[in-house]
Amino acid sequence: MIIEEIVGNVANLSEEEKQKHIEKVYLENSDLVKRIQRVTTDHGNEIGIRLKNPVDLEYGDILYQDDHNMIVVDVNSEDILVIQPRTLKEMGDIAHQLGNRHLPTQFTENEMLVQYDYLVEDLLKSLGIPYTREDRKVNKAFRHIGHSHD
């Protein structure tokens, strides 16, 4: 089976639709940005992904769906630093430092998420900014954004 488009996301399904048999494809965060890849489901079925559009995969994306079954993307958990600045100044300080390092960062309502890096952990300690180190699933890929200093 070759998957060429994302059908939808389980977050947008009705409760009735969520009752279908779910087969999962477990991906590493770095695989979420790959448009072309061969994967194996948790049922041992091999499928090819060749997305027509340049979009990143996300947690819960439906790759295939029929009346009774669906194949859904799940994301393996990874080592994450969960940064919880207490003030706007702390947020600005750490955001500036992470930006200077060109580190991909994700944001929630109250947290900044980065992949674990001992240098960032040392920086957070030295700045006194609260953080935790967690094994956590993230919904989207940590993506590097290209830039230049022209």
UniProtKB/Swiss-Prot annotation:
Chaperone as UniProt keyword: yes
A Pfam short name: UreE_N
Keywords for the protein's UniProt record, in alphabetical order: Chaperone, Cytoplasm, Nickel
GO molecular function: nickel cation binding; unfolded protein binding
Recorded GO CC terms: cytoplasm
Entry-linked InterPro entries: UreE, UreE_C_dom, UreE_N, UreE_N_sf
Record localization: Cytoplasm
Any one GO biological process: urea metabolic process
Gene3D superfamilies referenced in this protein's UniProt entry, alphabetically: Urease metallochaperone UreE, N-terminal domain (2.60.260.20), UreE, C-terminal domain (3.30.70.790)
Coiled-coil positions: none
Domain of life: Bacteria
Family recorded in the similarity comment: Belongs to the UreE family.
Biological role: Involved in urease metallocenter assembly. Binds nickel. Probably functions as a nickel donor during metallocenter assembly.
NCBIfam families: PRK13261.2-1
Protein name in UniProt: Urease accessory protein UreE
Species, as recorded: Staphylococcus carnosus (strain TM300)
